[in-house]
Amino acid sequence: DYQQYNASNTVLKSTTTNTVIFNVQQTLGVVLNYSHANANDDGEPNSGANNLQTQNNTFAGTAKEIQFDHYVWNTGQATDTYNLSLIKSNVPSCAVVRLYHADGRTLLTDSNGDGIVDTGGLAAGLSKAIKLGIYFPANCTSTASMDFDITAASITDTAVRNSTRDRLINTLNIGDSDLYNSNNSGLG
């Protein structure tokens, strides 16, 4: 009902109005970067400080895992879940690539049953720390630079997405030398 009053609170007009039901659409947003402090973004994978993380790696004949830190930021106005996809280049088939929770040991899973690894529900304004791990068995080596493009995409609207790139620059350690002088004369 609508009522109009005068200065002495006497009803001047009273009428019935229509009821309208409407939904306020919340905006969605995501940023995937390397910052634990803010949701800065330099665009899709490029050489910007928030979008390209590089590590050097030397293969020395032992098994190892290299990890990169990431943060998925919900920059929207509603709780959302973000599917995580990965495109890799120059990665040998013997290497195992995994996405982990912040502890670097617990694998991320598919929390909503759509078949894609995701962040789980993330409230507006919050971030989730994740890690990319690349495991190399002892006999798995490469001298190629490897790129890993990770994309976080909203499950509510798949057009809402953001990507970042990790680069691993590899070299081989071809062996070790140990010089030993058995007669202690100092002559080689």
Where do the model's predicted regions map?
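Short aromatic-acidic-glycine turn motif
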Residues: 29-31, 89-103, 157-158
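Structural beta-strand segments of beta-rich domains
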Residues: 64-68
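Short edge beta-strand/loop segments characteristic of extracellular beta-sandwich folds
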Residues: 69-73, 133-135
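Asparagine-centered strand-capping/turn motif at beta-strand->loop junctions
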Residues: 71-76, 188
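Short acidic, flexible loop segments centered on an aromatic residue
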Residues: 77-94
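Intrinsically disordered, low-complexity Pro/Gly/Ser/Thr-rich segments with frequent PxxP/GP/PP motifs
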Residues: 102-139
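Short glycine/proline/serine/threonine-rich loop/turn segments at secondary-structure transition edges
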Residues: 138-149
